[in-house]
């Protein structure tokens, strides 16, 4: 769910979920600083 709307699985690959003992704990996103044309 992004912005309250259901999305296609894997549509936002930078979104992550943290599970502890098979229970959802929290979520976040992966980010990286890019320079030029998408090169880290």
Swiss-Prot record:
GO biological process, one term: proteolysis
General function of this protein: Serine protease with fibrinolytic activity.
Keyword Transmembrane attached: no
Origin species: Euphausia superba (Antarctic krill)
EC numbers for this chain: 3.4.21.-
Record-given protein name: Fibrinolytic protease
Keyword Hydrolase: yes
Residues of the Peptidase S1 domain: 1-40
GO MF, any single term: serine-type endopeptidase activity
UniProt GO cellular component terms: extracellular region
Pfam families documented for this protein: Trypsin
Homology family: Belongs to the peptidase S1 family.
Keyword terms: Disulfide bond, Fibrinolytic toxin, Hemostasis impairing toxin, Hydrolase, Protease, Secreted, Serine protease, Toxin
């Amino acid at each position: 769910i992004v912005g309250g709307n259901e999305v296609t699985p894997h549509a936002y690959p930078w979104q992550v979920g943290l599970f502890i003992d098979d229970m959802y704990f929290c979520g976040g996103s992966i980010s990286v600083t890019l320079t030029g044309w998408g090169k880290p």
